[in-house]
From Swiss-Prot:
Bias kind Basic and acidic residues: ranges: 36-46
Secretion signal, residue range per the UniProt entry: none
Protein's name according to its UniProt entry: ATP-dependent RNA helicase TDRD9
GO cellular component assignments: cytosol; nucleoplasm; nucleus; piP-body
Gene: Tdrd9
Domain Helicase C-terminal: 378-545
Taxonomic placement: Eukaryota, Metazoa, Chordata, Craniata, Vertebrata
Tudor domain mapped to chain residues: 945-1005
UniProt motif DEAH box: location: 256-259
Catalytic activity: ATP + H2O = ADP + phosphate + H(+)
Amino acid sequence: MLRKLTVDQINDWFTIGKTVTNVELLGLPPAFPAEAPREEVQRSEEVPNEDPTAQAQVPVKATAPARPASTSGRSLSQRSSEMEYINKYRQLEEQELDIYGQDQPPSGPGLRSPLAKLSNVACIPETTYKYPDLPINRCKEEVISLIESNSVVIIHGATGSGKSTQLPQYVLDHYTQRSAFCNIVVTQPRKIGASSIARWISKERSWTLGGLVGYQVGLEKIATEDTRLIYMTTGVLLQKIVSAKSLMEFTHIFIDEVHERTEEMDFLLLVVRKLLRTNSRFVKVVLMSATINCKQFADYFAVPVQNKMNPAYVFEVEGKPHAIEEYYLNDLGHIYHSGLPYRLEEPVITKDVYEVAVSLIQMFDDLDMKESGNKTWSGAQFVSERSSVLVFLPGLGEINYMHELLTNMIHKRLQVYPLHSSVTLEEQNNVFLSPVPGYRKIILSTNIAESSVTVPDVKYVIDFCLTRTLVCDEDTNYQSLRLSWASKTSCDQRKGRAGRVSKGYCYRLIPRDFWDSAIPDHVVPEMLRCPLGSTILKVKLLDMGEPRALLATALSPPSLSDIERTILLLKEVGALAVSGQREDENPHDGELTFLGRVLAQLPVSQQLGKLVVLGHVFGCLDECLIIAAALSLKNFFTMPFRQHLDGYRNKVHFSGSSRSDCLALVEAFRAWQACRQRGELRRPKDELDWGRLNYIQIKRIREVAELYEELKNRISQFNMFVGPHHPVLDQEYPYKQRFILQVVLAGAFYPNYFTFGQPDEEMAVRELAGKDPKTTVVLKHIPPYGFLYYKQLQSLFRQCGQVKSIVFDGAKAFVEFSRNPTERFKTLPAVNLAVKMSQLKVSLELSVHAAEEIEGKVQGGSVSKLRNTRVNVDFQKQTVDPMQVSFNTLDRPRTVADLLLTIDVTEVVEVGHFWGYRIDERNAELLKQLTAEINRLELVPLPIHPHPDLVCLAPFTDYNKESYFRAQILYVSGNSAEVFFVDYGNRSHVDLDLLREIPCQFLELPFQALEFKICKMRPSAKSLICGEHWSGGAHGRFAALVGGCPLLVKVFSIVHSVLHVDVYRYSGAQDAVNVRDVLIREGYAELAEESYESKQSYEVLKGFFAKSVDTMPDGSVSSPLKDDEKHLLRILLESFASNRLGAPNCKAVLHGPFNPYELKCHSLTRISKFRCVWIEKESINSVVISDSPADLHQRMLVAASLSVNETGSTMLLRETSLMPHIPGLPALLSMLFAPVMELRVDREGKCYTGVLCGLGWNSATEAPILPEHDIELAFDVRLNVEDIVEINILRAAINKLVCDGPNGSKYLGPERIAQLQENARQKLLGLFCRLKPREKITPQWHEKPYEWNQVDPRLIMEQAEPEGSPGKSTSLYQLHTPVVLSP
């Protein structure tokens, strides 16, 4: 035995690779320097092949083997090197066990602890309880004796033998009868299993749930200090043990379903095994399973006894509840006739196999009849109790399909229940209820019912032998759920669900020979196929040595390359520190950072945990907690199959103008919270109705609220608190907060960065035939004479928005939606929704006539001239007219006769966008005459109900005189409407009963109000950040510049009836002031390129006004050909309307809608740069249409999570956020949040041209550390040393709020934290909000992309080491090293 061990010696003793010095052994004389201990000499003789160097070092030293030279940049050797690392660390562990074997605890039965008085004596269970007659009950005393006599016992028994429910009760009753203390924990792999078993026991024993028996699953804990038997999930127990670094809280640990080789299960076994051999040797551990590989587990928990490893005791529970017969497809020849071969590499359920399952369910009535002894059976003679059927399917999609097949069988009297992870507790309970008499219960389940849920009345199991497993793509490390064949172990577990109360039947829907030859025996352990991030963080918290040293002792150790990769990913996220000296970077270990400690305690992914911490840093913790909670659980937004478009529109509404799925979650959650706080959702029905109206699942949003509170509680131990909500006086605060939150999302989800390809403007303009891309979509495969069906086409798009016009042009049609003239320039939501319809593959069908039929029945075939005629249907004017074919995009309103105009501004829409009218004499006279003519007539009320887009007459009072003017209705609200006066450009609220019908003659004159947009200007970064596209300050300044006096405008171009102009203001005798120049000078705006259409219009206008306007042909003059087309068109439309053509007898399927400005996404990381990228259809950004195609600056998208398809060729992005369109934003954010960066310089070394971001370069191996995630960017704005310094200052500001140590952030007061948060916020805003915008440059790509170490070391400006020893900093962000530029 050991004598006089200090605390440090104890810590070193249980840490692999540490040296323990000055140790004396009792009973042995001190060894001379040249003499090895006797036990070790004896051991070396017995194990001659063991490494002699290792023998000489034990027991006083356990040295880790030298780190292999290969790192991430170089390929690892074959499997032999993987086994070498495992064997070396296992040898070290065995050497430690030699010491353990010298001091074994006494074995044998006996109670180890005195009675611990319960706080409530009445809680002591009755010992007269009669246990159910299950196989485990026959060997009750023997099992209890084994458990008390052995440290570890393995119980192997058939499903239904009573292991999970009865055995823990036996131990509890055994201790109670002896008035001895016990505290028993039983793990279950799934929440539903832990909660349902605890509920069943409490009901069976008539105990209060949460008294003697309780459960803890995730956030929910139903237990008290009196609880002596608690069921919990594997993860909950693991978290408890890792935090305590001991098992001593419990007397007995039952680990159920150990055959389910999840990552948590394997790590729990590792930790329990480790602690059993160190500081928790009196705890009893029981492993249980129906399909366990007993020898593997027994050897794993072996202990040294007299220099031999003694396996753990295995106890076989004899007997099964009832016999279970197995059948395969070969045995079902009477209902299965397909001869399709089954292939291991193609797991799939074919339609005929679904039909086999349905046929089986129908046949069970005959089987029940035969077993009951009845000779006849009729439809009316159903027995009152029909046995239940459990069907195992791989996922929710398959469950829904099978559910639909079964619900169509109404006459068969079936009650069908789905059972999967997203089912609520109430829905889960339905599975356990008895069916209505005469009905058969059918349970459609994923593998959740394989082991976690036992439905006692199941007699039939139908198993498709499939499952979905989470795997990691080998190249990208992104996860994907893959359909695969279930293992024989899992299928046997499923079979065991039958036969609980009577003889059972199991039908495996695969051929018998396929089962024998292809189905794998065991499932591949998760530790060998899934990310190890959370496991390695827990290893670091345990502080028992290098992760590879501890994981080498796992039941199925992960490969060294997987450990190495996970360590690098944890360094990338910031959970482990990046070494300041890159050559010292240990690819197998790292220092745990403050962030890493937080992540290890949070029940969310590493990136979501980082989101919470960065939210704390930048003062948006509340929003980040909501997002982290929402993204960790099932999405509470619902998009029903038939109402997907409505659900999508609702989600877009919640996101506002942010274009962020994450911000939509925040706004929806807060809207729900606000309604509850106002008392609007007191009744459950009111809350459910609110959820249905807003496409939100109430049960799921409640779960988010619970997790939000849990996260809030957990981070409080790290001195992070959600601050009180004070009223904010700064009007720009909400916009700044939104931007900061978007930046925090980018920081948390680095490197999930994406950009968009640029559309070809010239091709897009041609494809749209000059139509406005912000209001128009294109349809293809239009049938001949498509204009006849314009009403059908209008109705197809009714759910998108108000259709203004449809232009039919051969086999194409252009659908244009109405734009509110008082809203800013942007792609209409209707256009996004229309393109979304195409993405959802919504069928667009028209009921049509054959072209030959039309030509044969109307005008003797003369209408054939209209077959290729371009026709415009104007719903506003209610006209259908032929159009002249034109390829000219020039839009020249007849109201503009000169390029210089004097105007009055009547309505400012936003900065640079306004309405006005000309104030020259000619126009003033025209408006005066028009007003007089309108007001001379006897006006009549509207014949139809007012609706948006309707043109009518509305009153307006000017100089105390009320007159009627032409107006367009914008909105209708109650008894009033907002109208827009189309000849002046202003708007007003008018009572509905004051609106009048407009006579037809007043619709012919073009509207005289003009819409203007200042050319070559866009909002600055400051305006984008501090407002809704433009800041409040910019709005105020622009309104002051254009209001109160006439303006001179110089027309640059006319695009889609909008005049792009330069605006000049005269003030007194001074020269004219260019409004754009003022806004740029004051930092509200910056110069921008005009679009291709605008530049084309400029050239045409320049030539047009160079000639005499009088010599130009008048496009309004009618030609005889056009009149003839009009006549034929009218005849054809009348024939169609009067049904002379008869009922349509054909269907035409249209293709589209399309918009040529729709953007495609691509990744910025090296590994994914050329992979196809898809955004999930539920995301707001599943449709992105360019608002400013002339702006060539990169637009950035951030994804919260990524997955890949089964081949790894396509990436799927989830929960995306479109970042503000700020020049240089992708580069600045990448440099701000990258662990390491290397700047690129031009050939002369005078300016920075780009940056390479990632984990950097290892000079020792001469290879990049994590090349797959490297991001190469070329700057599109000029960045200099000052920008790099600003980024470093901001990184240092972040570090101050997330640091360890005695002066760390855990010990800061609230005032100091608030001060540091405000400092970080201001530094962040200052990085982007500059008075003078960064200069735009043409991107120059580096000649050696993704190559590190390209800078001359003499030009690198080394940063001062942070506080602490060099290279040992645990800061979240290291400071970047700028490159010295030549003068």
